[in-house]
A protein has these predicted regions:
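N-terminal membrane-anchoring/stem segments of glycan-assembly enzymes
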Residues: 1-49
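Catalytic donor-sugar/metal-binding loop of nucleotide-sugar-dependent glycosyltransferases
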Residues: 228, 237-255
Length: 283
């Protein structure tokens, strides 16, 4: 009996990863061949501003002084015609606050908020309170959005009322080290493959915290982001789905982000992801 049990466990341990790998590859290819090719062009760029849903792009910032002057000009050149930028300085110890104040004075689309250091979830909740948009987008302070990314994500939610959120397609910016180049392959192939495969189920499991768009009324319905969870993106994804909404993947909404280039930084990031997933399951 014990021998048969051990054999069954051995078969499962071998077959499960192989079976799941076959499924992810097959499903993602089906999505790419039969669905992704039918996606249209940007919709809202030629429309009058008053006919386009407003988007509040929230950017929580903690010690992003080295990145903001590079990232903000890209955000100001987005082709989507109706948006505001809300930068939330989460108690930064560098010159982040001074930078966002300077940009807010230079462009009326920018709102600068300041708070004591309370974490990303608290910063996003702060931004949600003042957001004027029908939709709220969340990106990281070091992220560079593709000029059409917001257009594609709004288009996805406008055409699909059952969805409460849509997540974009993160790509790695820093490729100067071997570790950085390895993560390019991970994000471009493995993570994209899994998101495409999950899309065939009708919903994906989690949004990407570096680039995502939510219906504002859905976020208010679920009470915003949980401030006691280490990975707010995993937690908010499950809150949205338990409230009865699905989540979409929009592969055309590209967003370039900085990733760890040292092993210790990568270890801390992946440990945080694992801890956040465990916290959400236990919750």
């Amino acid at each position: 009996m014990n021998q048969q049990f051990l054999e069954a466990v051995s078969i499962f341990v071998f077959m499960y990863p192989a079976g799941m790998a076959i499924y992810w590859v097959t499903a993602s290819l089906c999505y790419y061949l039969f669905m992704e090719g039918k996606l249209g062009q940007p919709t809202f760029q030629q429309m009058p501003k008053e006919r386009v849903p407003m988007v509040s792009i929230m950017v929580p910032c903690y010690n992003e002084g080295d990145n903001l002057d590079e990232a903000i000009p890209y955000l100001l050149q987005l082709r989507y015609p109706n948006y505001e930028l809300i930068f939330i300085n989460d108690g930064s110890k560098d010159n982040t606050g001074e930078i966002i104040d300077r940009w807010a004075k230079a462009d009326e689309r920018i709102v600068a908020l300041h708070q004591e250091n309370q974490g990303k979830a608290s910063a996003l909740n702060h931004g949600l309170l003042v957001a004027k948009g029908e939709y709220v987008a969340c990106i990281d302070g070091d992220a560079v959005l593709d000029f059409d990314a917001i257009d594609y994500m709004v288009q996805s939610l406008e055409l699909n009322c059952a969805y409460g959120a849509v997540t974009g397609n993160p790509r790695v910016r820093n490729r100067s080290t071997i570790l950085g180049r390895l993560q390019v392959s991970e994000f471009s192939s493995i993570i994209g493959l899994i998101k495409r495969a999950q899309s065939l189920m009708g919903t994906i499991f989690t949004v990407s915290g570096v680039c995502c768009l939510f219906r504002k009324d859905v976020m208010e319905e679920i009470g915003g982001w949980s401030t006691n969870m280490i990975t707010e993106d995993i937690d908010v994804s499950w809150k949205i789905q338990t409230a009865g909404y699905n989540i979409m993947y929009e592969p055309r909404a590209l967003c370039w982000v900085l990733m760890p280039e040292r092993l210790y930084g990568l270890y801390k990031q992946r440990l945080r992801w694992a801890q956040g997933g465990a916290e959400t399951i236990l919750k």
